[in-house]
């Protein structure tokens, strides 16, 4: 972080992308400006955005590979230049772009001799490789080579304990961090009481999303993080004086859903997708991450199941019920639903 004194002034709070470039398929750069900010605000925004960009942005990567009958990851396979460990490291570096949630399957199946690159990966329709030239292995002999892969969207750095996988399946330490680096600098403007600050933010990504997309997602995550403080009164939360005890409001979410289930006949609930329920993007993403794709998936969950979903909050429960209450009665009148 660099702080400098510069001359100039701005009249209204605004942000702008002042520079954007693509250095390579796996390196995007963007530079943004936010101003005017009061003294100290630039540091607050800069620190929060930097942490959110580096730790809260989701990415898609390969998390597991299955080679068949391979005794351990340090084995070598006849006709392949690289060891199993080297192939796993190459797979770890593959950059993928997608908006999927949950685990998906992919594969590689080729015949040598030839070089295997990222373009040889057979991916689900919603996933694509950012750089098809990324190397995986070199087949030096005319052999058939197949790998089964697992792909997952997550955030941060995920590790698994190494074991002797007798079925030839090996975990890959997933690095779901599409933002490579973030820098910010602060410039002070004005004189006396009219002094204000300008925040410059630099973002580098791996090509799976643009710096502008990363900035948008980080900002949205920060907003979601602070929403509970804004709605605490509306939710009817209360603290008892002089007692370290929190009394949450009564919520009959599961009871109401149970009542809904009793009256449904006709169209299968697995034909109604949660995309049709007009949920907020935050609630929708939480459900998708938990592999809840249809109304049947949603109604089969208990209240405890929902609250165990990562980042799922009390407001999300209320929002889901309000949405169901708004839309389902009409559907029930026209087409009685059933499981």
Curated annotation (Swiss-Prot):
**UniProt keywords, alphabetically:** Chloroplast, DNA-directed RNA polymerase, Nucleotidyltransferase, Plastid, Transcription, Transferase
Q: Where is this chain's protein located in or outside the cell? A: Plastid, Chloroplast
Pfam families from the UniProt entry: RNA_pol_A_bac, RNA_pol_A_CTD, RNA_pol_L
Main localization, broad class: plastid
The protein's annotated catalytic reaction(s) are:
RNA(n) + a ribonucleoside 5'-triphosphate = RNA(n+1) + diphosphate
Q: Name one GO biological process term.
A: DNA-templated transcription
Domain comment in the entry: The N-terminal domain is essential for RNAP assembly and basal transcription, whereas the C-terminal domain is involved in interaction with transcriptional regulators and with upstream promoter elements.
Q: What does this protein do?
A: DNA-dependent RNA polymerase catalyzes the transcription of DNA into RNA using the four ribonucleoside triphosphates as substrates.
- Please give the name of this protein: DNA-directed RNA polymerase subunit alpha
